[in-house]
Curated annotation (Swiss-Prot):
One of its GO terms (cellular component) is proton-transporting ATP synthase complex. It is a peripheral membrane protein. It comes from the Bacteria. It is found in: Cell inner membrane. F(1)F(0) ATP synthase produces ATP from ADP in the presence of a proton or sodium gradient. F-type ATPases consist of two structural domains, F(1) containing the extramembraneous catalytic core and F(0) containing the membrane proton channel, linked together by a central stalk and a peripheral stalk. During catalysis, ATP synthesis in the catalytic domain of F(1) is coupled via a rotary mechanism of the central stalk subunits to proton translocation. This protein is part of the stalk that links CF(0) to CF(1). It either transmits conformational changes from CF(0) to CF(1) or is implicated in proton conduction. This is ATP synthase subunit delta. Belongs to the ATPase delta chain family. GO terms for molecular function: proton-transporting ATP synthase activity, rotational mechanism.
Length: 186
């Protein structure tokens, strides 16, 4: 991870921890989740909003006024709305996408859920996803949601990432290992 990305992730994580703790104290995790989903959708749909949070040309006051208006219009959770206003004052709105990801992860962890990133050479069938979900749930002891992607360069097998753990049973990695072993011998 590059240094600026890790700095952004660190900033986002600190805000996420505070927002989550306050929402939890207020027993409003559902409202927080709704706000996260709404903001994620708005960021995906609105180039103007993405420009607002990323542009250094927009002043603090303009950013704060705009994000406050957006929060009011979207009827966001008060904790989230106040945090966005504070982030605008501190010129930290550029970390909003990472903040939303960190908050989503915190909510999933509070519910005892974890997301597994699964890459396969071809699309997994519904039965394969169900079996993999069951197996991973037993291994990690939590409810697992699978985020499946197709990567034809794997040739065959799977690459599974759950949290900081990765299991690579792809043909590509086995061929790379074999190639490295042959280089050592020859």
């Amino acid at each position: 991870m590059s240094e600026p990305a890790s700095i952004s992730a660190g900033i986002a994580q600190r805000y996420a921890t505070a927002i989550f703790a306050i929402a939890q104290d207020n027993n409003d995790l559902k409202g927080l989740e709704t706000g996260i989903n709404d903001l994620t959708a708005a960021l995906g749909e609105s180039a103007d909003l993405r420009s607002l949070i990323a542009s250094p040309l927009v002043s603090r006051a303009e950013q704060e006024a705009a994000i406050t208006a957006v929060a009011k219009k979207m009827k966001l959770n008060p904790v989230l709305a106040n945090a966005l206003s504070l982030m605008a004052q501190k010129r930290r709105l550029f970390v909003l996408p990472q903040l939303l990801t960190a908050l989503r992860d915190a909510l999933a962890e509070a519910r005892g859920e974890v997301t597994a990133e699964v890459a396969s050479a071809k699309a997994l069938t519904k039965t394969q996803i169900e079996k993999l979900t069951k197996t991973l749930s037993e291994k990690v002891g939590k409810s697992v949601t699978i985020n499946a992607t197709v990567d034809e360069s794997l040739i065959g097998g799977l690459v599974v990432k759950v949290g900081s753990k990765m299991i690579d049973s792809s043909i590509r990695s086995k061929l790379n290992s074999l190639q490295n072993a042959m280089k050592e011998v020859g």
